[in-house]
Amino acid sequence: MNIMTGCLAPTSGTVIVDGMDLQQEPEKVKQRIGYLPELPPLYPEMTVREYQDFAAKLKKVPRLEQLQQVVQAMNKTGLIEEQDHLIRTLSKGYRQRVGLAATLLGNPDVVILDEPTVGLDPRQILEIRDLIRSLREEHVVILSSHIHSGQVAFDLV
């Protein structure tokens, strides 16, 4: 996961995304990748909306597109009703959604998810799995999971 996202350089081989080599064109490739680590780096003192705006700026989402992309990401992840809540008040499942919404900003071609359901209760796992399944319509989804039941959401395992 760390090599595919550009966090770690490969000792051999290459990572190619849309015909571009990650080592030769890291910024261009990273713009096409959305990454959700197992423990998303969230700021508990921010509201959901503030965090999404912050993430959009970090991802260099053009200012004119920022509002639309933030609202769209919150809609996709079921966070519109939660946008004014502090992240620290959210359940683990909703905090995971906050990280996933931020991952979708910039409209990445590839979405890489590292253990997105770890620590969630059974209901939250089903909700996140359905959400991930819906992402397949617009993104290539790469998922790391130790839970084999997660395989039902994917075409290739």
What are the roles of these predicted feature ranges?
Residues L100:
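Hydrophobic anchor residue at the start of the ABC signature
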